[in-house]
Amino acid sequence: SGLAKNIKDTLESTPYKGDTINVSTPRISDILMNDVRWYGFDTENPNHVDVLINFAHNDFDQTKILEIAHRAWKNDSTKYIINFSSRASQPNISKGHLYASQKSSLNHLSNNLTYNSDKSYKLTTLNLGLLNHDDLPSLTWQDVSGMIYMLITSYPSIEIPEVTVQAHANYQDVQSDKTTLNEVYYHLHTDIL
C-alpha cells in the first residue's frame, strides 16, 4: 500500500545512530504459514527483524500475527512489535461492526499481553484515525511514518502500550461530514446506474 511504502522509505532514508534502518516487507501468509519458524523471527537468519510492524488488516489475521510474534519473541527484550489498529476499536464509535470487532480483538490481545503476560519485548498499538482523506481532516502517511520512526528510535527504555492518533479536528464534525460525503457519493453512483 502507499502507507507501507511511505513507512519503508521514511525508515530507510532517515539515518539513526549513523546507520540506516533496513525494512523487510513480508506477506501475511508467510508469517501465518510458518508460524514461529518464519525467517524474520530466527535471529540466526541474516534477514531476521528486530521490529515487526503488524500492519496489514485482513480479517482477524493481525490478531493471529501478534499471537505468533508473542510466542516467537516472548523472552527477547531487544524486539519490538508495533500494531496498526484503529480508533474504531473503541466501543460504540464505529458503524463498521466487523471491522471494529477485528481491530478490538487486536487491541484486546495487545492489552492482555502487555498487562497479563511475562513478555520481554516492547509492544505498542497505534489506534489511527481517518487516514489520507482528500476532503476531510485526516492523518497523512508522513504523519504515521514519522510516528513509527519516533517510536522505534526515540524511547529505547520506555514502552508505550497504546496511542490514539488523529487529525486535530472535532471528531463529531468529521464523522458528520464523512456521512454527508458518503451519501453524496452513493447518490451520484446510484443516479448514474
State where each predicted segment sits.
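Short-chain dehydrogenase/reductase
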Residues: 66-70, 109-110, 148
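Rossmann-fold scaffold of SDR-type NAD(P)-dependent oxidoreductases
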Residues: 49-58, 65, 80-83
